[in-house]
Design a protein with these regions (language model features):
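Short N-terminal edge-element motif at the start of the domain
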Residues: 1-8
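Catalytic core of non-heme Fe(II) oxygenases with the double-stranded beta-helix
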Residues: 9-111, 115-117, 121-142
Length: 142
């Protein structure tokens, strides 16, 4: 469940992310999200394309986990909070709206983030909050 207020997020949590899954050669790591809430404004999933080349992108991701949060935000000129739009480092390319019992499946290496544009609606109550089930699979590339 997503429950944190934007000001509680770490630097890494304020960026989109990809699921670093190990997969045997010739297979594709897949990730999934099953939306278990019936309140679409709690948000679906955004997908992003990195704008940076590989080396600076890697450094951004490393720094988001190693630097003190405020130093990271100041250095990269980013704000603490849920990533809901494009920035200088990532372009938002797709949003999949939430719908009760909808499952999305996507390549695990695609950058993504929850569409948390109404964080004031988040709650720790699984009956009314943004409850999801996340799964990870390996698919054949044949």
């Amino acid at each position: 469940m997503v429950t944190l207020a934007p000001e509680q997020l770490t630097a890494a949590q304020s960026l989109c992310h990809r699921d670093r899954l190990q997969a045997p050669p010739g297979t594709l790591p897949l990730a999934s999200v099953l939306y278990l809430f019936d309140d679409p404004p709690l948000g679906g999933t955004h997908f992003f394309r990195p704008i940076l080349e590989k080396a600076p992108l890697t450094q951004l991701l490393i720094d988001s986990n190693r630097m003190e949060a405020e130093a990271f935000f100041q250095h990269y000129r980013l704000s603490r909070g849920y990533m809901t739009d494009s920035n200088a480092y990532f372009e938002k390319v797709l949003t999949v709206p939430a719908r009760y019992n909808r499952m999305i499946v996507y390549p695990g290496m695609k950058f993504h983030s929850g569409d948390i544009s109404r964080p004031e609606a988040l709650t720790e109550n699984p009956l009314t909050g943004r409850l999801t089930f996340n799964g990870f699979f390996t698919g054949s590339m044949a």
